[in-house]
Amino acid sequence: MEKIKRVIFQQLLYMLLPVLMSIIIGDPFELSPVGGNKFRPVKNEIAPYKVVMENWRGDNKSRLGLGRLQFVDEVFGPESLEFDLLGRGPYAGLADGRVVRWMGDGIGWETFSLVTHNWSEKICAKGVHSTTPKQWKFESHCGRPLGLRFDKKTGDLYIADAYYGLLVVGPEGGIAKPLATHVQGKPILFANDLDIHNNGSIFFTDTSQRYNRVNHFLIMLEGEATGRLLRYDPPTRETHVVLENLAFPNGVQLSKDQSSLFFTETTNCRLMRFWLEGPKSGKTEVIANLPGFPDNVRANGKGQIWVAIDCCRTKVQEVLVNHPWTRSVYFRLPVPMQYLARLAGMRMYTVISLFDEEGRVVDVLEDKEGDVMKLMSEVREVNGKLWIGTVAHNHIATLSYP
């Protein structure tokens, strides 16, 4: 009798197991990190992990770990940093929707600009919680300034805001004026970074046409490539599509002679170059494959560019990247994203790398244990010091260099 019961139980188990697995993978209760979204993973155009890591120049001294954290719990997610024509600053775009300016020890930080009249302290000012999910439902209301650039001719500050598009504010600050919120009749869903050409044109990235900033992780997990490089022309007030079908286009930096433009593709872990002039005009090329996921790119004034790179790649991620069906299953599991990332071997540490304009590595600084630097977003080299922003933490890091 016991044997019969055991056989019946096993048969029921075999019958129910596929049903149970289909329920888990189908995620009908939307318990997974991608629940409630039309998650459609595709294969990425990414260089092989082994090849990239074998040729990558590391930092055995972990010099980035010698950095100093400043303004702790005074600034919230300072993604991009900028200094004005008089050398004042840094200016920083914060997760609570403000652009702030450092006024010195006697005064501290002051609000320099807002990207919308909608901003209110009651709704938007979450302090140290601004970089947590508590702020996410307010981001589209309050704004999220990402890229910052001063026009060297006028002193105006141009802002790429994730929700309000491309904006500009005068040297005295105030409410920023929107310049580009739509292109080809469709809204700019995720303006990210920008740079200003000597002819006045502003080049900026629109990271995705499907997901906004709050859902930025879905862009990477899915591998979707609906991002664009855009150009705004002040005389005509028109916005044009320069490049499309990009996988999480992020940081933007014009070359020293303005003949080309560098930008990062975060999902594909690479630094790209688009030619504006010369025999290669209109062509795009990969100039560096990276060990992790790049954010902003900034010139140091010497014909070299800094790239901030986070969460270095792993062998498990290589499998997920090359086989979209594995992502479809893995990220539909009813497990919080932080644990899935940990299981995939994702380490939260930062690499910053200095390249020449041909894509050759000049220097690499790492914080291999992530003791000081995590989720760094931008590097500015100013007067023998590196100023390093972060999208997700409440401080600015500095480090003497070289």
Regions found by a protein language model. Give the residues of each.
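Beta-strand-rich domains and repeat architectures in extracellular enzymes and scaffolds
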Residues: V7-L17, I23-W56, S62-V99, G370-S377
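Short, conserved, GDST-rich strand-edge loop motifs in beta-rich repeat architectures
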Residues: G36-P41, F204-E224, D310-R347, T398
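Beta-propeller domains
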Residues: P41-K43, P48-D59, L85-V128, G165, ...
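Surface loop/turn motifs at the tips and blade-to-blade linkers of beta-strand repeat domains
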Residues: L69-V75, S113-T116, W136-H141, L179-K186, ...
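Residue-level detector of Asp-centered blade-edge/turn motifs that repeat once per structural unit
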Residues: D84-G87, F150-T154, I196-N199, K256-Q258, ...
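Short loop/turn segments that connect beta-strands within beta-propeller blades
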Residues: M103-I107, G170-G174, Y232-R237, W275-K280, ...
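Asp-box/WD-like beta-propeller blade repeats and closely related beta-sheet repeat scaffolds
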Residues: K126-L146, D151-D156, A160-M220, E224-G227
